[in-house]
Amino acid sequence: MLNRLTIRLGLLILATLAPVISGAQAIFVSIPPQAFLVERLTGDLVEIEVLLPPGASPATYEPTPKQMAALERSQLYLQIGAPFEGPVLAKVADLMPDVRIVDCRAGVGLQPIGTDGHDHGAGLLDPHIWLDPGRMKTIANTTAKALQALLPDQSPAIEERLATLHAAIDDTDARVGEALAPLAGQTLLVFHPAYGYFTRRYGLVQRAVEVEGKAPSARRLATVVDELDDQTLRTLFVQPQFSRTSAQRVADALDCDLVELDPLAGDFLY
């Protein structure tokens, strides 16, 4: 019994100290696509922590005290404009002077949230910039510079990996553009307006049921169904982070399929 306890205690201590023993720098990001970027740029040179857990909604999630304690021990936080970042940034600024914050939206060019090609978000900016390959290359550049500052000895390797990543993003962009070209001008019906940048890039029109991260009211649902009833829409896309109940009601009313599509998936390359 004592031997088992000793072994378990030893393993626990080893797991706790592993990042320190390995010498790896701790990097925090907000969402999985950022983690994918950092991994492609650094390999296993850093420990990557993602604030948003699988299945959680960026509109409502609150980081746990355990996550905030881990963030305090990190060297770098890469923000991207997720809704939950505000309180996190305030705490980092007030209580974590050793944590460097880098805004990965720099130079990206934000656009208003649109549900049907127009701004229905009361002036709110669309945070889903990672769904546009061109903008993702800009995000990758900012991320690479932050990592090079943190790991100066690895700067040439990071630069080389950045070039490889750019080529992979360009390849994905070209193939997606070719696949969607015959659908130019058609409507992409989504529950949450996450695909504004994506649809603009590839000549589609996003039409969303939900606005401003709020569950649609019965009146809103009825309006959407009435406006779209004369259109031939075969699919309504819903995020796994949102309840399917309201989305299913719309899909049933329009007699279209309900399909899950995750804009927060880590690997964005096709």
Language model feature labels by segment:
Residues 8-19:
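Bacterial N-terminal signal peptides
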Residues 1-5:
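N-terminal secretory signal peptides that target proteins for export/translocation
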